[in-house]
Design a protein with these regions (language model features):
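Conserved short loop/turn motifs at secondary-structure junctions
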Residues: 99-110, 265-269, 389
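Structural preference for beta-strand elements that scaffold enzyme active sites
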Residues: 57-62, 102, 124-125, 154-156, ...
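N-terminal catalytic cores of secreted or lumenal carbohydrate-active enzymes
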Residues: 1-64
């Protein structure tokens, strides 16, 4: 559909050279994306990631099963957080055939005690926001520029604020450059519904075809110049490299080998910041030629520096103001009593049937766990707070809880509606090999 739309755009803009050039660019980009995804990788991107991982070019780590906010879940019951961690670990093992070294804490959300669950999952390291390490007990001797081991074992690395600000901030950082593509100006809102055709499907929405650059903070936007945008990305990559080298040089004067950890949401690169992948490629290529410092991973750093300080990190997130307010305020706090009731019921059912169960009981308990895990996704609370899709987020979470409750009530009454169970299994079929015994 997008290829067809850009072909129509090529014809529509044939007398407008700059717009025609942009239409050609999008036609070529979407055509190449389709060739790569369909022809080269047979619609199986996991195989591509497996190849990159096995060749040593990419380290992939695990995360919680459905991006549940672990500090809140752990406060409800230990089993709630434990299942998120261990199911996430199990999925990683199924996909890659080995246990993960690292673990991404959703929203970098940490509370003391979580590391015991990570240790149970055999995780060697995780990432905190800077204040999680800085306010640890005792204070870290090397600030945020070296990891610290937690009392239970796994090492905690801290996010570097300087590099995060330079890349993440749309106002202070690179993505706000006037040459870069404007995210919010899209032909999905500019062109007629008839011309958009199947891309629109009857409603206005982002199509991914955008002809304008950021230009400035006003509403007037100039046409996008791809060459100028790529040049800006290359300059920013050079600047980022120079800033990191200056940082490393200054820190190294204190007599240790520092690591700068720069984690970002993947959606920044290519989605919000269209030129982000160009920036990454330029930075990686330039760094590959450096002799003064190099790219590394937390696993490689720990292997080279096995002796580090032991501290208890502080409760922290990378959300607004560094705590849980985004996911726990008057707009969304009501969800947690529902989630707590559900996990208590899940744990009771799991304990009752932990030793032995029939095939139908196993199916029901797996589906109850799926619905609970899906209801626990932190995205729902985030969207309620952000007001961007509050109704959708509320409906999604309540639908999962409604299916959980209906199925649980049938289970307790020994009156399973197998047609309803099959419908639930068809709707929510994530984690086919899920172990519900983690709730015991």
């Amino acid at each position: 559909n997008l290829i067809d739309l850009t072909a129509r755009e090529q014809r529509r803009n044939r007398k407008h050279p700059q717009l025609r050039e942009l239409a050609d660019f999008y036609f070529d980009m979407f055509s190449e994306d389709r060739r790569f995804f369909v022809d080269e990788w047979k619609c199986d991107l996991l195989s591509a990631f497996r190849e990159l991982r096995s060749s040593g070019r990419l380290q992939i780590i695990a995360s919680a099963a459905t991006h549940g906010l672990l500090p809140i879940l752990q406060q409800q019951t230990l089993q709630a957080a434990r299942a998120q961690v261990l199911v996430g670990r199990d999925v990683y093992v199924e996909l890659f055939g080995e246990e993960p070294n690292g673990f991404w804490l959703p929203e970098c959300a940490y509370v003391p005690g979580l590391e015991t669950l990570l240790q149970e999952a055999n995780v060697r390291w995780f990432v905190l926001d800077a204040h999680g390490l800085l306010f640890g007990k005792p204070r870290p001797c090397r600030s945020i520029y070296a990891p610290c081991y937690t009392p239970s074992g796994p090492a905690a690395f801290a996010r570097d604020r300087d590099s995060s600000r330079q890349v993440w901030s749309a106002h202070e950082g690179y993505p706000g450059d006037p040459a870069y593509r404007e995210f919010y100006r899209d032909v999905g809102f500019d062109l007629s519904m008839q011309h958009l055709g199947p891309v629109a499907r009857g409603t206005r929405k982002f199509s991914g075809v955008k002809y304008h650059r950021i230009t400035g903070r006003g509403n007037e936007k100039q046409l996008y110049d791809r060459a100028a945008a790529k040049n800006a990305a290359a300059k920013h990559a050079t600047h980022f490299l120079e800033q990191r080298w200056q940082q490393i040089r200054e820190i190294s004067e204190f007599g240790f080998d520092p690591i700068i950890v720069a984690p970002f949401d993947a959606e920044l690169f290519g989605h919000w910041w269209f030129e982000g992948p160009v920036f990454l490629e330029e930075f990686i290529r330039r760094t590959a030629n450096e002799r003064k410092f190099s790219l590394t991973t937390p696993s490689e750093y720990l292997a080279a520096h096995p002796t580090e300080q032991i501290i208890e990190p502080a409760a922290s997130t990378w959300g607004e103001n560094g705590h849980l307010a985004v996911w726990l305020d008057q707009s969304n706090a009501w969800v947690y009593s529902h989630l707590q009731m559900a996990v208590q019921r899940m744990s009771a059912a799991a304990r009752t049937h932990a030793q032995s169960c029939s095939a139908i009981t196993d199916r029901v308990l797996k589906q109850l766990a799926r619905e609970l895990l899906l209801a626990q996704a932190s995205d729902w609370a985030f969207l309620m707070k952000a007001h961007t899709a509050r109704e959708y987020a509320t409906k999604r979470m309540m639908d999962h809880l409604a299916r959980f409750t209906r199925l649980h009530d049938q289970f307790v009454a020994n009156a399973i509606d197998e047609e309803f169970l099959r419908d639930c299994e068809w709707r929510d079929n994530i984690f086919p090999n899920l172990s519900w015994r983690y709730y015991v």
